[in-house]
C-alpha cells in the first residue's frame, strides 16, 4: 500500500470533517441526547411519583370511606335511639292521657253516682212521706195499711 498525496488529502479532509463534526455537530447532538435522557428520567420519576401519589390517594379515599361508613352507622344508631326515645315518650304521653281520661271518667261516674243516690234518696223520702200520709190516713184499716206498705216496697 502506497501512501500518496490523495490518501494524505483524504486523511486531512477526514480529520477536518472529524474536527468539524466534533466542534459543531456533536455538541448539539449530544445535548439533544442528554435532554432526551433527562426527559425520559423525568417522565419515569413523574410516573413513579404519580404512582405513589395514587397509592396515597387510594389510602386516603379508603380512610375517608371508612370514616364515612362509621359516621353513617353512628347517624343511623342515633336516629334509632332518637326514634326509640320518641316512641317511648309517645307511649308515656298516651298512658298519661289515658290515665287522665280514666281519672276524669271515674270522677264523673262518682259524681253521677252521688247524684243518682241523692235523687234516689229524695225519691225515697217522697215515697216514704206519701206512704206515711197514706198509712196515717188509713190507719184505721190494717189491711189497707199493709197494702200501702207493700205498694211502697214494690216502688222501692
UniProtKB/Swiss-Prot annotation:
The chain crosses the membrane at residues 5-27. GO terms for cellular component: plasma membrane; proton-transporting ATP synthase complex. Keywords: ATP synthesis, Cell inner membrane, Cell membrane, CF(0), Hydrogen ion transport, Ion transport, Membrane, Transmembrane, Transmembrane helix, Transport. GO terms for molecular function: proton-transporting ATP synthase activity, rotational mechanism; proton-transporting ATPase activity, rotational mechanism. Its main location: membrane. It is a single-pass membrane protein. The keyword Transmembrane applies. It is found in: Cell inner membrane. Pfam families: ATP-synt_B. PANTHER family: ATP SYNTHASE SUBUNIT B, ATP SYNTHASE SUBUNIT B', CHLOROPLASTIC. Belongs to the ATPase B chain family. F-type ATPases have 2 components, F(1) - the catalytic core - and F(0) - the membrane proton channel. F(1) has five subunits: alpha(3), beta(3), gamma(1), delta(1), epsilon(1). F(0) has three main subunits: a(1), b(2) and c(10-14). The alpha and beta chains form an alternating ring which encloses part of the gamma chain. F(1) is attached to F(0) by a central stalk formed by the gamma and epsilon chains, while a peripheral stalk is formed by the delta and b chains. F(1)F(0) ATP synthase produces ATP from ADP in the presence of a proton or sodium gradient. F-type ATPases consist of two structural domains, F(1) containing the extramembraneous catalytic core and F(0) containing the membrane proton channel, linked together by a central stalk and a peripheral stalk. During catalysis, ATP synthesis in the catalytic domain of F(1) is coupled via a rotary mechanism of the central stalk subunits to proton translocation. Component of the F(0) channel, it forms part of the peripheral stalk, linking F(1) to F(0). This is ATP synthase subunit b. It comes from Francisella tularensis subsp. holarctica (strain LVS). The gene is atpF.
